[in-house]
């Protein structure tokens, strides 16, 4: 079989990143970097069932019996529901359509499924790292290499950091590596290291002689983002309690043509003509292709490139037939 049909969400990663950056802007305006009041007045509290029994998150029991821990999480719940509610709703809608895939990929890589919502808070990293060129759902600073378990590229025509499947595998590899470096009971310190840097976290652990996220004073942005991630997860699991009503979102799907080898360069515009679709829609389904050079090249130098091309649901077979008729397909396809 030269192609396979894979159920994947068309999450339009560019749109997701715009939403994410909106959350960052709101946070910048609504969360002044000052010490919280010791006696906060909040509108939204933690659900009773969360407080009633030990709350385990990403392999770690959160010490909610401590008032300071409750405050840090409750403050972020109120921030999301009061200051960032519209963006929160959009993120939960996106999670409805693509969350299943992220959880599936993370589980396969041995990473807790709570990380499926971690991407929503990552734009907060950008504030303190303006010189770093982040990209994709997981805000990867650079593509993974072969020794990290997944080989990715960022070249003239593609950036694999924008591919949801490759990027998630890359993120999983890196978060597992960070966990082995910073230790800790669960995964919170690894997440903090992903946000704030492993060196800073290890230095803080040595300085404070602890591996507990809740016991070590960390940079405010790091503390807020991890608490926001937990808050977002609690809200998602208790939508009725927080009066969050989201119409059921059907998983958006696309098909993948795997192992495609071309006789000549194939442009996004040509694919759009074959399928009778706007070129913008085809590009959104293939987000790793760069908009300033929107092609699937037949060769890079003298090397034949093997492609995975994504189409809307029900269009995979049509595109294969059109490519055959137009003489785009090499006789020996990688999938055969």
Where are these regions (language model features)?
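Extracellular LysM carbohydrate-binding repeats and other cell-envelope/extracellular binding modules
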Residues: 136, 218, 281, 285-335
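Catalytic and binding regions of secreted/periplasmic enzymes and modules that target cell-wall glycans
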Residues: 172-206
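Short, functionally critical alpha-helical segments immediately adjacent to catalytic or ligand/cofactor-binding
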Residues: 111-127, 190-196, 282-285
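Substrate-binding/active-site groove segments that recognize
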Residues: 133-155, 168-171, 175, 203
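Primarily a LysM-type cell-wall glycan-binding module
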Residues: 247-276, 334-336
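Bacterial N-terminal signal peptides
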Residues: 11-22
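Second-shell loop/turn segments in exported
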Residues: 78-92, 102-108, 126-135, 153-166, ...
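An acidic, Gly/Ser/Thr/Pro-rich helix-cap/linker signature
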Residues: 25-110
């Amino acid at each position: 079989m030269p192609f396979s049909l894979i159920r994947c969400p068309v999450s339009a990663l560019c749109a997701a990143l715009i939403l994410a950056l909106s959350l960052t802007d709101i946070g910048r305006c609504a969360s002044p970097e000052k010490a919280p009041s010791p006696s906060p007045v909040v509108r939204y509290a933690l659900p009773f069932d969360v407080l009633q029994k030990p709350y385990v998150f990403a392999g770690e029991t959160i010490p909610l019996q401590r008032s300071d821990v409750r405050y840090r999480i409750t403050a972020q719940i109120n921030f999301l529901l009061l200051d960032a509610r519209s963006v929160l709703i959009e993120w939960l809608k996106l999670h409805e359509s693509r969350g299943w895939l992220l959880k599936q990929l993370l589980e396969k890589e041995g990473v807790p499924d709570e990380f499926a919502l971690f991407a929503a808070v990552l734009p907060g990293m950008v504030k303190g790292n303006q010189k770093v060129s982040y990209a994709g759902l997981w805000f990867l600073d650079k593509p993974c290499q072969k020794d990290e378990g997944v080989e990715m590229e960022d070249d003239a025509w593609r950036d694999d950091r924008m591919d949801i499947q490759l990027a998630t595998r890359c993120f999983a590899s890196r978060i597992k590596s960070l966990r082995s470096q910073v230790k800790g009971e669960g995964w919170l310190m690894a997440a903090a290291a992903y946000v704030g840097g492993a060196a800073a976290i290890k230095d803080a652990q040595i300085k404070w002689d602890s591996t507990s996220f809740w016991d070590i004073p960390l940079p405010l942005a790091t503390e807020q983002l991890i608490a926001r991630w937990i808050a977002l997860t609690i809200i998602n699991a208790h939508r009725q309690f927080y009066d969050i009503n989201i119409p059921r979102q059907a998983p958006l799907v696309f098909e993948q043509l795997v192992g495609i080898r071309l006789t000549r360069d194939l442009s996004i515009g040509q694919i759009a003509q074959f399928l009778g679709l706007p070129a913008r829609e085809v590009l959104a389904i293939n987000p790793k292709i760069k908009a300033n050079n929107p092609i699937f090249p037949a060769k890079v130098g003298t090397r034949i490139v093997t492609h995975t091309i994504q189409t809307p649901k029900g269009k995979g077979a049509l595109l294969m037939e059109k490519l055959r008729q137009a003489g785009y397909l090499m006789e020996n396809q990688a999938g055969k």
